[in-house]
Amino acid sequence: MKRLGIVLSLFIALAAHAQAPDESVHQALRQLKTTMSNALNNGDVDTIVANVTPNVVFTTMNDDVCRGPAQIRAYFQKMMTAPGHVVKKLTVSFDADALTILYGGDTGIAYGSSNDHYDLTDGGKFDIRGRWSCTLVREGNRWLIANFHYSANVFNNPILERTRMYLIGAAIAAGIIGLLLGWFLGRRARKA
C-alpha cells in the first residue's frame, strides 16, 4: 500500500510539473493577444509589426495579402491614414475559441472570433463578427505571429445588408418613377 502511495505521488508530481510550462506558455500567448488587440484599437502599427515574424503572412478581411512587416505597415496606412483611406477608426475584441494548439515548444495554432466596430470616412458605421486563425512561433523567449488570417461571413454581414437595402430602395424608386412617367405619358396621349 505504501508503494502505491509513492507511485501515485510521483505521477501527480510529474503531471503537475508537465502542466506548469504549458500554463506559462498560454499566459504569454494571452498577453500577446491583448497586446495586439490594444495596438489595433489604438492604431499602433509599430507595436503590431514588432510582434510578427519577418516573413509573416497576413490575409485581411477585404482579401488583401500582406507579407512581412513593411507590407503590413503599408496596408494599415492605405486603409487608415493615406489620402482616400476608408477606415477612420477600428475597434476589435478578439476571443479565442480554445487554448492554443501547441506543437513542440515553439509553434502554436490559435483560432477564434472577433467583434469589430468600423467607423468609415464616409460617415458609415457598422459592426461585424469576424473569424480568425493564426500561427504563432517562439523565437528566443518571445512569441510572434507568423500567419494571421481574418475573415467574415460573405453571406450574412452588415455590408451585404446595406447593399441589399440600397437595391430595394432603388427598385422602389424606379417603380414609382415608372408609374408616374406612365401616368403622365398616358394623360398626354389622351389630350392629343
Model-derived features: positions:
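Short, well-ordered alpha-helical segments enriched in acidic and aromatic residues
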Residues: 42-60, 67
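Hydrophobic h-region of N-terminal signal peptides that target proteins for export
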Residues: 9-18
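Hydrophobic alpha-helical core bundles mediating ligand binding, dimerization, or RNAP-core interactions
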Residues: 33-36, 40, 52, 76, ...
